[in-house]
Amino acid sequence: MTVDLLLGLQWGDEGKGKIVDVLTSNYDIIARFQGGPNAGHTLEFDGIKHVLRTIPSGIFHEKSINIIGNGVVIDPVVFQKEIEGLEKFNLDIKSKLIISRKAHLILPTHRLLDAASEASKGKAKIGSTLKGIGPTYMDKTGRNGLRVGDIELEDFKERYRALADKHEAMIAFYDVAIQYNLAELEKEFFEAIEELKKLDFIDSEEYMHQAQKAGKSILCEGAQGSLLDVDFGTYPFVTSSNTTAAGACTGLGIAPNKIKEVYGIFKAYVTRVGSGPFPTELFDEVGATMAKIGNEFGSVTGRQRRCGWLDLVALKYAIQVNGVTQLMMMKGDVLSGFETLKVCTEYNYKGQNISHFPYNIEPENVTPVYKEFKGWQADLTGMTTYDELPAELKEYIEFIEKEVEVPIKIVSVGPDRKQTILK
C-alpha cells in the first residue's frame, strides 16, 4: 500500500498536471482532494494540449481509477462539458471516474453571487475567477450547501430551490448591476445533473480505506498552490480551500499517518495570476519575456500571469507547511537565454533581513534580497539526461537543494510528458 501526495508550492500553475500524468503509471488510483473548476491542469502529449478543470489527471491512463473527493466542489455544467471534451478522444469516462457523495455542488446562483460580491468591492477586488468557488465553500462551512449525494434524494429540486432563493436575496442585497437569465441557467444546470447521474457516486472515505487495505497505490492530486491556501496563503488573496497537504486528509478521508511521499512542484521562476502581493514580481522586459516564452496565460481564465524571480523564502515556507520530501522543478527551459538570473534568498522586512515568510508581504513591508547566477544559453528542450544539462543550470538546481534541504528529483524541460528529466 502506498499513499503519496502531489501539490503545488507557489501560487498555482506550477505544472502539477504534467507531473501527475508522468507519475500516473505508478499508481492504481488518482484522487483529487480540493478546489473546483477555477483551476486548470494542463497536460500535453502527442502534440495535443489538454486542460482538465475538475477531473483528475490520471484520466488519460487506461488502468487508473480517478476519484473526485469530498473536498472538491463541482459545477455540473462545466463538468459535463469537460467530459464531452474527453469523450472525443474515445476515453471510457464512466469506468474510470467516480465521485464522492460528499463533494459539494456549485449552483448557477453561486456564480452570480461570486460576480455580485466581486463587483461590490470596487478597487478592493481580490481577483476572483468568478466560478462560484468562494460562495460554494461558504455554503459548505455554513452548513447550507448541496452535495452530490443529494442528487439521489427525491426532494433534491426542493432543496435546490430553497438555497437558490436565499442566494437571490443575497444578490439583491449587493445592489450591483448583473445581467442574467436564471431560468436559462437553471435549465442548463438540471440537464447537466441528469448527465452527472450516469456516473458512479461513492462514499469516498470508505472506498479509500478499502483500497488501502487491498494494497492499492494512491496518488492524491492537489489543485492551485500552497500560497493560495485559505489558512497559510497570502490572505485574503487566496482560494477558499486548503491547498496544502492537510487538505488531502480532509478532502479524501485519508489518515495523516498513511501518507508517505509528498511531492512538491515549483517553477524555476514564480508566477501569479490575479491580485495579491508578489515580492519578486518583475515589471520590466525580463518579466515580459518570461511570460512570452513560458506562455504564461491562465488555462481557465486566459489572464496573463505576473512573472518574477524564484522566491526561496516563500518556497521554504511552503515546503515546511507541507512536509515535502521530494521536489520537482518545472519550466527550466523558459530561463534559457537570460544572461543573469536572480534568486530571492531573504526579505528585507521593515528594515531587517529575515529568512522566514512573514504575516504581511505587501510591497511597503518587504523588499527581496537577491543572489545572482550566471544564466545559460543552451536549448534544454531536447535534453533527456541530467548530465546533458548546462553547468550553470546544475549550479542553480544544487543551490536550491542546499537552501531548502530537499532534493530535486525531476527537472522539466518542456511541456510534453517526454520532456522530463529524472535526476
Placement of each model-derived feature along the sequence:
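Non-transmembrane, aqueous-exposed alpha-helical and coiled segments at domain scale
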Residues: M1-K423
